[in-house]
Design a protein with these regions (language model features):
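Short functional hotspots at interaction and active-site rims
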Residues: 1-183
Length: 183
């Protein structure tokens, strides 16, 4: 059966409230001091990037498991309905919850996942190959431009910073189109 597929890359990420210090320019002989939050808190995102348009969609699950992955896929499908006559080719890594998601939807073909099955064909990346998933670059750039070398006094401040960064990429844009296309 011949069908038209739209490529979509998916992955999850945590952003920690702890300050991450990276290289920077400092006056010779000076030692920079960087504040750091005294706790271990994080905010989590499940992201989908469409290289054809450069659009980024994110959901905010509390934790990562097959149920939250399925919820995230459904949220993506509501926000980005599949065009008539097409399906999404959803590229995922080998996280255990991704394997279970794919098994339940495609292999066991459970009826409660028919809505996803008719819209999505899954593609599994080879093990240990984050370099083949361009959404990893989205996470890297977001950290580099928004969270590295920055002190966040609260988790809500970190979340609003990351949300604002992702909002810029929610509409079609050339930056993600270029970043997420293999040439």
């Amino acid at each position: 059966r011949s069908e038209s597929l739209i490529l979509v890359y998916q992955d999850e990420v945590h952003f920690q409230i702890q300050t991450t210090v990276t290289a920077g320019w400092y006056k010779k002989g000076s030692a920079p001091t960087v504040k750091s939050f005294p706790g271990r808190f994080k905010t989590s995102y499940s992201g989908f990037v469409i290289p054809e348009t450069g659009e980024l969609f994110t959901a905010k699950p509390e934790k990562f498991n097959y149920e939250t992955t399925i919820d995230s896929i459904r949220s993506f499908l509501v926000a980005h309905p599949v065009p008539e006559g097409k399906r999404y080719a959803l590229v995922m890594d080998n996280a255990p919850w991704h394997k279970k998601t794919m098994r339940l939807i495609e292999v066991e073909a459970l009826p409660e996942y028919e809505d996803i099955r008719k819209c999505v064909a899954f593609i599994k990346l080879p093990p240990y190959s984050p370099d083949l998933n361009p959404i990893e670059q989205v996470w890297r750039i977001t950290r580099r431009e928004n969270t590295h070398n920055v002190f966040f006094s609260s988790l809500s401040l970190l979340e609003s910073t990351v949300d604002s960064a992702f909002e810029v990429w929610a509409s079609p844009n050339d930056q993600l189109r270029s970043l997420c296309t293999f040439k």
